[in-house]
A protein has these predicted regions:
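C-terminal cap of metal-dependent C-N hydrolases
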Residues: 17-20, 74-136
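Single conserved hydrophobic/aromatic residue that forms the stacking wall/gate
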Residues: 1-11
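His/Asp/Glu-enriched, well-ordered alpha-helical/loop segment
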Residues: 9-82
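Conserved beta-strand positions that form and line the central face of beta-propeller blades
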Residues: 1, 68, 101
């Protein structure tokens, strides 16, 4: 009904390949700050968060060389300022959809750096180099 009434645009897959499509509800950019906030509020222990977001997904999905700080594993790390207070805003969202269900949600604890394969790629919210990410190996 939405398309037949002219309320939306249709894109063929070849016109808009992922990741250049406006995806549905975002969460990748906000889940870690929200979860760190739960650590700071005493709802979750830091080691539980590491298990939930780093180690266990790699174990469950069989993702190779990720999820742990170990020799031979990819040096992918997130640097967090546990005391940094941020109010999440739609304008901060890098996803093409441009919004978040956490708009105006205040968090304590925020990522200030990202290291991918040993290279600092984000610092204080600024992308420093073009993505060097590689497809996951299972």
């Amino acid at each position: 009904p939405v398309l037949s009434r002219g309320l939306g645009d249709v894109y063929k897959r070849q016109d808009k390949e992922y990741p250049n499509t406006p995806s549905g509800m975002p969460g990748v950019q906000t889940i870690f700050p929200v979860m760190i906030d739960h650590v700071n509020n005493g709802k979750l222990e830091l080691n539980q968060l590491i298990n939930l977001m780093c180690e266990n997904p790699c174990k469950i999905f069989g993702i190779k060389n990720k999820g742990f700080i170990k020799e031979g594993f990819d040096a992918d790390l997130t640097i967090v300022d546990m005391d940094k207070e941020v109010t999440i805003k739609n304008e901060m969202i890098a996803s093409k959809c441009g919004w978040t269900p956490f708009h105006n949600y205040k968090v304590k604890g925020f990522p200030i750096g990202t290291i991918v394969n040993g290279i600092l790629v984000m610092s204080e919210g600024k992308i420093l180099v073009e993505s060097k990410g590689q497809p996951l190996k299972f």
